């Protein structure tokens, strides 16, 4: 399987700022460490047309699509149905998924209402993913070399399903890419002055990426956390790239700014 991934997040609450999109950040980190290149994080409202459009574009441009949100029983939970529309197929009740949903509710004395049955609807041929924390199953769908995964929006549910079922699959099929990172903390040098140094370090190898994150005041008390990461075909090679970039970064900062710069690594 190729390594381009998109993350889709569904929910009005994300777009109005009521909820911070921690799911996307968590998934992006997971996918990156698995060797996938996350090229887009897209947030859409609980509107069918928007979800359909996002799905179609993602499936067309990515190898792996991970979506969170909109799998529950409420009227605005329509992600699974919109996914079917994006594929041009009729949503069907998956027998295995229905057993999962029924078991969750009937064990607590709740009836299996149409709203709850909706959580078991998915495209023909899709695989339901057990939810050990909540009630809505995840959905895994493969076609034409593409892998699409739909997960609940509740973080604990999303994380549990991903780690139990999705991560092992992606790890087994993912590109042979390893990831390494390091942080260098620099005090006393403004970000604008560090920028040329970072550009020079990044010229060492196209697999190395360096990004500065200011934490202090640019003029009065500059404080930078500089994140260095690299990907390579082996763990040792990735670590060597990061080590070389880190050493060169520190060397250049000391050369240019001397005692003015206070440097530490983490």
From Swiss-Prot:
Gene3D superfamilies: MoaB/Mog-like domain. InterPro entries: CinA, CinA_Arc, MoaB/Mog-like_dom_sf, MoaB/Mog_dom. SUPFAM superfamilies: Molybdenum cofactor biosynthesis proteins. It comes from the Archaea. Coiled coil: none annotated. HAMAP family: CinA_A. Belongs to the CinA family. This is Protein PAE0875.
């Amino acid at each position: 399987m190729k390594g381009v991934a998109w993350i889709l997040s569904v929910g009005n609450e994300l777009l109005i700022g009521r909820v911070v999109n921690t799911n996307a950040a968590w998934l992006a980190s997971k996918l990156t460490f698995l060797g996938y290149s996350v090229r887009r994080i897209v947030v859409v409202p609980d509107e069918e047309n928007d979800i359909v459009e996002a799905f179609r574009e993602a499936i067309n441009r990515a190898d792996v699509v991970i979506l969170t949100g909109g799998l529950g029983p409420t009227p605005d939970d329509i992600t699974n149905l919109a996914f079917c529309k994006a594929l041009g197929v009729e949503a069907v009740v998956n027998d295995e998924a229905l057993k999962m949903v029924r078991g969750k509710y009937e064990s607590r004395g709740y009836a299996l209402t149409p709203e709850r049955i909706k959580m078991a609807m998915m495209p023909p041929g899709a695989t339901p993913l057990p939810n050990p924390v909540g009630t809505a199953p995840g959905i895994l769908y493969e076609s034409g070399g593409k892998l699409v995964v739909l997960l609940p929006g509740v973080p604990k549910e999303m994380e549990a399903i991903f780690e139990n079922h999705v991560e092992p699959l992606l790890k087994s099929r993912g590109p042979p890419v390893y990831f390494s990172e390091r942080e260098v903390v620099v005090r006393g040098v403004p970000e604008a002055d560090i920028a040329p140094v970072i550009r020079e370090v990044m010229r060492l190898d196209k697999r190395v990426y360096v990004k500065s994150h200011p934490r202090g005041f640019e003029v009065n008390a500059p404080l930078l956390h500089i994140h260095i990461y690299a990907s390579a075909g082996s763990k040792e090679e990735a670590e060597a790239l990061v080590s070389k970039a880190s050493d060169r970064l520190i060397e250049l900062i000391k050369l240019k700014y001397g005692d003015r710069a206070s440097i530490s690594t983490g």
